Each structure stands twice: as C-alpha cells, then as structure tokens.
Amino acid sequence: VHIDIAVIAAPAADSFGNANGLSGDSACGLLGFALADSEYADRVIVVTDNVVPFPCVPWQIQGNNVDMVVAIDSLGDPSKIVSGTTQITNSPDRLLIAEYVSSFVEQSGIMRNGFSFQAGAGGISLAVIKFLRDRMKERGIKARFVRGGSTKHLVSLLEEGLTDYVLDGQLFDQDSVRSMRDNPRHVSTSPFTSYNYHGKGNFASMLDFVVLGATEIDLNFNANVVTHSDGYLLHGIGGWQDCLFSKCTILAVPSFRDRIPVIVDDVTTLCGPGELIDVVVTERGIAINPR
C-alpha cells in the first residue's frame, strides 16, 4: 500500500521530529505501530502537544523520516486507553477457563525457568496471567521474557521479579506507561521485530505459548477472530495471526456467548488454520489438537 501522508500523534517530540509516547500529559507508551508509516510514507507529519528541546529520547520515531512537526494544545485523554475489554473477567465460567489454561501450562511442563509467553489483554487472558503468577511464585519459577500488550497485570510480573523482561508492542493502561518509562527492562518493540513474518528478528516463534481468544472455533480447530456467525466484520485482526507461530497456541473461549455457540461445525470466516491451533480450552474442558 502506497502511503502519501502519515500523520503521527506523539505525546513528546522535538523540533527535528524525533518522538516518543513516554512523556508529557498525553503519554500513551510507545509508537511502534506508526514506525512503518514514518519510514514509508511520502510525507510524515508529527503532531504533538509537548515540544521538548532536542534530543527527544528515546526516539521511537526518528526525526530523519519526519517532514513537519505541528504543535497543538492537546492530543487527548490518555486515561481513555483503558476499555472494558482490558479488565480481568468476573465471570465464574471464564475464571474457570483461565484456571484450566494455567493448570495446563504447568502440568504440561511449559512453565519452567526461562520460558516465555504472551497473553492478550482480554478478560480471560488477564485472568490467566493472574493464575499463572500465583503458580510461578509458588514454584519459584521465573520467565525469561513475556510479550505485551501490557496491562498492570503483566507489569506486576516484572516488578515482582517473575520475568527478566517485558517486550512490548502496545500498552493498555497508565501502569504500563509508567513501567516502560521508568524500567529499562520494559522494552518497546515494533512490528518489524515482533510480528513481521519476513523479518529476521521476528520472535513470535520463540514464544513457548500464547493465549488468544476467538469468536468461533470449528471441529477441525480452525478459528475465526474477525466476525461472528452473521458474517459482519467486528474489528481488525491485529497480531492474532502472527501469534499462531508460537510453540503452543492456546485458544481460551467460552462454549457460548449470548446463547450463540462458539464451537461450530465450520467457522464463518477462516482467520487461523487448524494446523496452527494446538489447544482449545472452554469451561467444559481442554481439547488438544490430535495433529
């Protein structure tokens, strides 16, 4: 896709165009998803409400690629980063699913010193982090790295010494913003290094397991994450497909949502082929892909 103009909102920038998301009243964390736009667009405009003296470091966007810096009064309210989908679930069924996942990870031997994982920012995934944290503390196990998007639950693993590093591509609350700003072991990454299938530094395949959601899963372990059974588009896929290249891909879903089955004969929209899905966990139990 040829990009004519890229407009990048940056919570901090200098007059040369070096920019980051770590400081200022609008701090949101990191700008990794805008990196490709800044490098490939014909014209790049950085918009900021916080012009700082050169150099603005660390520079997540390099001024060498920026044509213009525009100062405005306010970029927005960073507290709105948090949404209802980035809260730990209160549902007994979903908490049971999370408990099953953490138990599987422990009993299968995946949870060991030096392991790595990614859990998303949905309610079940956040509960998995909580339960996994308890099991790691009980057994004295420390991860080498965990992969964000981060919330305070992932940050707690770093601050409690349960992981050496958090490698992050997206932040979902102000605790994560603070952590990345203040803790050198909370590292910002870009899609080039984390999820680019063609990138030599792609570390998605280094993850020992990932926990993901889905809108539908069929009997052949194929998964849909972008539509419901009515076929209407819900949202973008994001990095979901790239996560499937982990060593163990776990889909944690309820059997039903609003009385509509999540486990179906055939998915409405194929987003992830069954050959890349290893485990499906619902409140009714654990299904392991025989392939």
Predicted feature descriptions by range:
Residues G120-L126:
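Core structural elements
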Residues V1-S116, A127-M136, A143-R144, H153-R291:
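Conserved phosphate- and dinucleotide-binding cores of soluble alpha/beta proteins
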Residues G148:
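Active-site histidine-anchored catalytic micro-motif
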